[in-house]
């Protein structure tokens, strides 16, 4: 007996912003990737590092329309662990145009001098100040700092 089975190829759905195609990692992404914020309401947007290797620091520079959105709060993520003693976290704001600069550095511990994997860099609480559309974009100054090991 011979059995012949037919099947249809499954298309992958990348609705989850953390599902980054393998040829585009490492990556820094927003989650959720699209959000509607009602006027005078707030919404939390997370910034994630996806499939990074040997990272010791991150600079995420994010632009937005400050006529439409206001940043209410920025909280440290867990990429470098829950213990704030192992990391430094700085946030700077520039109002015109709306820019947030997040610097997040890993100080290391007895087990490791860098971090690999996927994790949250920060959570940003935005408030809708006016009706309109605002993009959130990473600038070209967004970068990963990698562990340097000198050749032996």
Residue ranges and their predicted role:
Residues 7-150:
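Acidic, low-complexity intrinsically disordered segments
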